Design a protein with these regions (language model features):
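Short, recurring structural edge motifs at helix starts
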Residues: 253-256
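Asparagine/serine/threonine-enriched low-complexity, disordered tracts
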Residues: 20, 26-31, 67-101
Length: 438
């Protein structure tokens, strides 16, 4: 990556956005604080790792509604479009979810959901939501886990309840489904998403998964937080202790599918190493160039070793020194979400540089083998969230690969098969969904 272009999106810009961004329906940035207070930033560097983090959303005004351009006035076979309209079979709010008698096999039920080619109605600038939902609903590992826990889903877990209802509607409908119930409940809980203003698909995805993670948390009696002591312990022991301590407070199918574990390695000049760990839901990858860049380049930059700018006291030599910091996966996730940070919230500019991404992603060099997870780790691309246009006039849509074979475009209510596959060199790719290769 050319150094002369790194000023395009500086790391301190990202820090400013994460710390100060607050979006309403009319402004991109204001001085109001974020509605979430659990952002965890490591400000020892420009890398700004996020633990269970949220990045502010960015409003896109005047979004066109693809429902206005549906096929009802066109030839039904034109351009391989699958035109769907709303089916209310599962909209009865007075019934708890119980599909035991409907589909006897989880695998059959799973297949009917993840192979669905049914669109979602645009309720008015809700393409950001539909794009995220289609990628999540076609996430095999997650949906399979969800089906095994469906007995625990009820009105007491409203976000999970309406998400699962939506999955079932898509699996059993031949017409586009309205996500209005999920949208309504989500907006009641998060005022930022109330109404029909446009929002950011990455933030919506994080908040949605956070909600379901909290609702489906299987820990009834949480253990008190215990600070991890790493002195004299091996990496594998520290990694295990952190994970067990964390899961003593939070453990859910969302965590099992989407969360990875990061190890931060701090090295003193005397050679002493100290460790810290954190759970991550996705990897926010900064675009610091206007030139074409590869996902491998962005991951190299995310995980590169760096020097901490402030001095800390070494536990071994007792001296206050600048430490070096290295970051790797100690436990890679089953589903890896890569969030391309195309929008600079500070300058209100969108980076439209081309990004190349492989359909098979190898991340072995970003895994710490000393943590006991040294298996060869490759990921298969199965979902893409795209954003076309500008900040003030743009649109979200999804690409999803079905049966590991054919790619489909999910553009709100419109769904079509992409002949010849997708282009893995794109200036619209915004979020990439990879599943671990088994």
């Amino acid at each position: 990556m050319s150094k002369k272009n790194k000023k395009f999106f500086r790391n301190d810009d990202a820090t400013f956005a994460w710390q100060n961004g607050y979006i309403n329906n009319n402004k991109i940035n204001s001085n109001k604080p974020s509605i979430y207070d659990h952002i965890s930033l490591d400000q020892s560097s420009g890398k700004n790792f996020l633990s269970k983090s949220l990045i502010p959303n960015y409003n896109f005004e005047d979004i066109y509604d693809t429902d206005k351009y549906s096929n009802k006035n066109k030839n039904k076979n034109e351009n391989n479009i699958i035109n769907k309209k709303t089916n209310n079979k599962y909209n009865n709010e007075n019934e708890n979810i119980n599909y035991t008698n409907e589909i006897p096999s989880i695998n059959r039920e799973l297949n009917s959901i993840i192979t669905s080619t049914v669109g979602l109605s645009n309720l008015g600038n809700t393409c950001f939501m539909n794009t995220c939902l289609q990628n999540l609903i076609h996430s095999e590992d997650f949906i399979k886990r969800l089906l095994t826990k469906k007995s625990s889903i009820s009105r007491a877990t409203p976000i999970s309840y309406y998400f699962f209802n939506l999955c079932k509607e898509l699996a059993n409908s031949t017409r586009a489904v309205s996500p209005n119930k999920l949208k309504e409940k989500f907006g009641q809980k998060h005022l930022l998403f109330a109404g029909y203003g446009q929002n950011d698909t990455q933030e919506f995805c994080r908040v949605l998964l956070e909600d379901m993670n909290n609702e489906l948390n299987e820990v009834k009696k949480k253990k008190p937080y215990v600070e991890l002591k790493t002195s004299g312990k091996s990496k594998i022991q520290c990694d295990k202790e952190f994970d067990e301590n964390f899961r003593g407070r939070e453990s859910s199918i969302v965590m099992d599918s989407f969360y990875g574990q990061i190890i931060n390695i701090f090295t003193c000049k005397c050679g002493f190493k100290d460790y810290s760990f954190q759970k991550v839901l996705d990897l926010p990858l900064l675009l610091q160039t206007s030139d074409m860049v590869s996902i491998d380049d962005l991951l190299e930059e995310y995980f590169e070793e760096e020097e901490i700018k402030f001095e800390t006291k070494c536990e071994k030599c007792g001296k206050k020194r600048v430490h070096k910091k290295e970051v790797k996966f100690s436990q890679p996730p089953n589903i890896l979400i890569l969030s391309l940070q195309r929008i600079n919230n500070r300058t209100k500019r969108k980076n439209t540089c081309y990004v190349t991404f492989p359909e098979i992603l190898d991340i072995n060099k970003f895994i710490d083998v000393d943590c006991g997870h040294a298996k060869e780790t490759q990921y298969i691309l199965y979902g893409i969230g795209n954003h076309s246009g500008t900040i003030n006039f743009g649109h979200y849509y999804a690409y999803v690969k079905l049966n590991d074979k054919y790619w489909y475009e999910f553009n709100d209510s419109m769904v079509r098969r992409i002949s010849g596959g997708i282009n893995t060199r794109s200036n619209t790719a915004y979020t990439l969904f990879y599943k671990k290769r088994i």
